[in-house]
C-alpha cells in the first residue's frame, strides 16, 4: 500500500512525463508547487517507488520514467476526469447533429476528428450490417432509366446505390414495389433480406406489379449490400510524431500493422463494458507493446454495435482521451436511437 506522499510523487512523475516525454528527477519534482518535501525525502520515496516497480531508470538519464505497472496504477487509482474545452464539445456535438444519421459517414468523420484532437491514431469499427434490421427503403427516380435506391437500417446505416430501371417498369410499379417492401420487410434483419424477398415478397409483388420479371431482376441488385463491418482510421502516421517512435526500426512493425488494418478487426470485435485501457504488453500484439489502446463501445440497449479506440504511446494523455471517448460514444449511441 502506497503512502499519501508516495501517491503524490508517483502521480506528479507520471503527469510530468506525459507532458514532457523527459525522465523526471528529484530536482524537477522539488520545483513543483504541490511537492513540499525536501530533496532527500523525494529521493528516498523515488527509490522506494522504483523498488516497488512503479518507476524505472532509463539508460540515458538519471531521472525516472513510469513503468507499465506505474501506468496501470495511475489509470486505475489516480486518474481524474478531464473537462474538455467547450469548443471541442461543440465540434463533436455538431458532427452528430445531422438530420439524417448516417452511421458509416459519422464513423469515418469520428476517426478523423479524434485523431486531430489527440494527435494519436484513432480507429472506429462501424456497425455490423448483418445484425441491423431494415427500417425503410426508398427508390428515387433520377430519369427514365435510372434511380437511386436508399436503404436505411435501425442503427442509422444508410446505403445508397444507383440502379438501372428496366424500360418495362414504370413509375407506378416502382411506387407499388416500395410500398410492399416497406410493409413486409421493415424490421427484418439485413442478413435475411435476400432470402425473404425471393421466398415471400416475389409472390406478393406478382399481384401488384405489371412487369414482374423485370422488377424482380432490379430488386436482386438493389439488396446486395456488404454485411460485414467496416473499419476507419484517422491519423495513421501520427505515431511518428511521438518522441518514442522516432526510431523507424522500432516502429516499423506497428506501422505495418496499422497499414494492413485487418488485425484490428479481431482486437476491436471483443465484447466489453465501458472504457477499456490496455497498456504496453497487456496488448496481445507484440507490435503494440510500447503502446496503449483505449477503447469504448457504442450500443443500443444490450446490443454492442461498434467500437471507438485510440492508439498512442504508453505516455498517453489518459484522462483527456477517456473523456473524449466517453463523449463520442454517448453521442454515437444517442444518434443511433434517433
From Swiss-Prot:
One of its GO terms (molecular function) is DNA binding. Keywords: Repressor, Stress response, Transcription, Transcription regulation. It comes from the Bacteria. SUPFAM superfamilies: GAF domain-like (SSF55781), Winged helix' DNA-binding domain (SSF46785). Negative regulator of class I heat shock genes (grpE-dnaK-dnaJ and groELS operons). Prevents heat-shock induction of these operons. NCBIfam families: hrcA. This is Heat-inducible transcription repressor HrcA. It comes from Bacillus cereus (strain G9842).
Amino acid at each position: 500500500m502506497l503512502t499519501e506522499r508516495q501517491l503524490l510523487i508517483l502521480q506528479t512523475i507520471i503527469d510530468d512525463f506525459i507532458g514532457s516525454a523527459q525522465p523526471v528527477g528529484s530536482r524537477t519534482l522539488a520545483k513543483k508547487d504541490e511537492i513540499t518535501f525536501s530533496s532527500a525525502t523525494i529521493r528516498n520515496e523515488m527509490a522506494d517507488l522504483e523498488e516497488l516497480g512503479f518507476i524505472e531508470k532509463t539508460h540515458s538519464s538519471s531521472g525516472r520514467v513510469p513503468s507499465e505497472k506505474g501506468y496501470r496504477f495511475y489509470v486505475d487509482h489516480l486518474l481524474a476526469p478531464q473537462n474538455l474545452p467547450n469548443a471541442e464539445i461543440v465540434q463533436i456535438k455538431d458532427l452528430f447533429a445531422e438530420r439524417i444519421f448516417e452511421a458509416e459517414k459519422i464513423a469515418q468523420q469520428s476517426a478523423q476528428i479524434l485523431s486531430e484532437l489527440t494527435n494519436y491514431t484513432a480507429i472506429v469499427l462501424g456497425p455490423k450490417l448483418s445484425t441491423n434490421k431494415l427500417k425503410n427503403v426508398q427508390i428515387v427516380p433520377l430519369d427514365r432509366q435510372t434511380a437511386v435506391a436508399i436503404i436505411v437500417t435501425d442503427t442509422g446505416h444508410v446505403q445508397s446505390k444507383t440502379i438501372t430501371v428496366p424500360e418495362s417498369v414504370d413509375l407506378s410499379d416502382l411506387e407499388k414495389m416500395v410500398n410492399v417492401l416497406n410493409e413486409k420487410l421493415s424490421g427484418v434483419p439485413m442478413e435475411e433480406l435476400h432470402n425473404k424477398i425471393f421466398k415471400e415478397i416475389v409472390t406478393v409483388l406478382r399481384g401488384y406489379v405489371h412487369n414482374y420479371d423485370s422488377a424482380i431482376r432490379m430488386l436482386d441488385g438493389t439488396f446486395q449490400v456488404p454485411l460485414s463491418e467496416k473499419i476507419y482510421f484517422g491519423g495513421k502516421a501520427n505515431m511518428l510524431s511521438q518522441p518514442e517512435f522516432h526510431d523507424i526500426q522500432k516502429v516499423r512493425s506497428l506501422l505495418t500493422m496499422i497499414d494492413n488494418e485487418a488485425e484490428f478487426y479481431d482486437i476491436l470485435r471483443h465484447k466489453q463494458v465501458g472504457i477499456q485501457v490496455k497498456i504496453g504488453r497487456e496488448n496481445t500484439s507484440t507490435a503494440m507493446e510500447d503502446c496503449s489502446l483505449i477503447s469504448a463501445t457504442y450500443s443500443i440497449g444490450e446490443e454492442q454495435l461498434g467500437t471507438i479506440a485510440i492508439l498512442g504511446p504508453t505516455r498517453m494523455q489518459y484522462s483527456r482521451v477517456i473523456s473524449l471517448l466517453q463523449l463520442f460514444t454517448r453521442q454515437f449511441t444517442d444518434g443511433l436511437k434517433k
